[in-house]
Amino acid sequence: MDNLQSIKAQFIAQINAYQPEKDRDIVVFQCNTETTFSLLAWLKAQQYYPQFYLHGRDGATKWASIGQVRQFSDVSAAAHFIQEQQLALLGGLQFYGDALFVLPRLLLQQRQDGMTITLFIDGKQFEQDKLVALACLSTFEKQTALQTVKQEISLISQKADQAEWCRWVEQGLQKIKQGELSKIVLANERCFKTAAPLAATDLLAESEKYNLGCYHFMLAESEQRAFIGSSPELLYRRHGLQLKTEALAGTAFMGEDEQQNQQQSDWLLHDKKNEYENQLVVDGICQNLQPFVQQITIEKVELKKLRKVQHLRRRISAQLKAGCGDKDILLAMHPTAAVAGLPQLEAKQALRKLENFDRTWYAGTLGVMGPAYADFCVTIRSAFIEQAENDSQLCVFAGAGIVEGSIPLLEWREIERKAMGLVSLLQQNQL
């Protein structure tokens, strides 16, 4: 594209004209343009990693990045860097707390009225690092067309079949009966082999079309492996000291029949078990936030309707105390009772014993963290895509909240339904 070629030339000229300054930690070059284009098609053409993509749930903002100038595996160090440099980082926490935050090489932030493109170079070793930056710009103007994802897929493995997963549920219910837990969220992983190579960018673009009202995210740490998903769930959003979060828990089906969907909605809004499950998440969030906020407002229950399922949701807003920031909120809130259980620590310990796999990024959190603004989603409805020579492997995750009164077989059907949000995109006549 001519405009991207022009922006690339501007960046190269700015880099070559820059005179390094002593004690300048990060050098920032920035360009604004009214041009908009598919960030996923752009990412597909880029060769530098890690790659990050986040499409905000409100639909107004998208972020895409390639490469990295700084990387942090500690939330405190990441938060300190943000305050010191007044720059935003991308990344998040895996389910069990391992952190990854990066200052990318190139960051594209797309809004409805245009785009801001930012290039970062390490000021402490500018001459060496500018060569990496220039190499990263070599394909800046390129895009690769997104392809259809419809193809044959076959199930090759699952961490638990129906019988074993239902046994996990029975064990979880036993812990609830004994008073060790009030809720536990059990998940499963199912792996499919595709008939032809499947690009993560292609599948995520397809998901954006059909899985509306969601965050859409991708974290590709290499060309061979990417984590993607379309999550309905906000962990939290912060503007200054204003915090917004939500309790998303309690599930019913959604399908093609509007009358049946309405019946499911009415049932969900009046079902005591689902109401209780959602209230546990509200209680868990409020309890974890309490040391860091001045006041909490909880709104009335509403429905969050998706393509395959619908959920109970209660929006929660709070005013942060002065001096409290993202480090405090992230570590206090994650993982919420919506994806782990309650009490938080005991639920995580139980999951390590019951589930026979490491969740890594599933039910973690990914987002943007800056000085005045943060936006994090919960990485559910997600999958890993691994590339082989002639095909790909798609490993899909789904979970269900188990509380007193949960019926194992119904919970199994729920996770099957949730997994279809991504799997059905590949299958003919399954949308």
From Swiss-Prot:
It catalyses: chorismate = isochorismate. GO terms for biological process: menaquinone biosynthetic process. Pathway: Quinol/quinone metabolism; 1,4-dihydroxy-2-naphthoate biosynthesis; 1,4-dihydroxy-2-naphthoate from chorismate: step 1/7; Quinol/quinone metabolism; menaquinone biosynthesis. Keywords: Isomerase, Magnesium, Menaquinone biosynthesis, Metal-binding. Mg(2+) binds at E277, E414. Belongs to the isochorismate synthase family. Catalyzes the conversion of chorismate to isochorismate. This is Isochorismate synthase MenF. It comes from Pasteurella multocida (strain Pm70).
